């Protein structure tokens, strides 16, 4: 397992969930929800800079790529690919990777519902919870296979 903090991103149309791993790459935890739109990439860049200011090495950013249950990519995936390309340009030289995020928002909603969070309380953190699930899956995959997860994103 490669050492270093990873940042997990769940990009939605209105909000972006952000999570981080510990430096050993064992556990993903929520960071914040960023409002989608003007300044969103700058905010994510500041999150990475804050990690580095605290002495962490940010190894990579992992972005969830929505696919259908059959594995096909639709319009939402195209939007995420475009976002990830812009993010890669913003955070370079830190690499950005796309990983399969099938069902993470549904799983995050169910998890929060099971914890008794309802309505606005759930909406406020569901994107962070989805980012945690995306990042944790990437960490677990790397630990199991020994290979970096997903596909690398080229800057746009």
From Swiss-Prot:
SUPFAM superfamilies named among the record's database cross-references: Ribonuclease H-like
The entry's keywords: Cytoplasm, Hydrolase, Nuclease, Ribosome biogenesis
Subcellular compartments: Cytoplasm
Disulphide bridges: none
InterPro entries, per the entry: RNaseH-like_sf (IPR012337), YqgF (IPR005227), YqgF/RNaseH-like_dom (IPR006641), YqgF/RNaseH-like_dom_sf (IPR037027)
Broad EC category: hydrolase
SMART domains for this protein: YqgFc
One GO cellular component term: cytosol
Gene3D superfamilies assigned: YqgF/RNase H-like domain (3.30.420.140)
Signal peptide limits: none
Any one biological process term the GO annotation gives: rRNA 5'-end processing
Function: Could be a nuclease involved in processing of the 5'-end of pre-16S rRNA.
Assigned protein family: Belongs to the YqgF nuclease family.
Protein name: Putative pre-16S rRNA nuclease
Source species: Nocardioides sp. (strain ATCC BAA-499 / JS614)
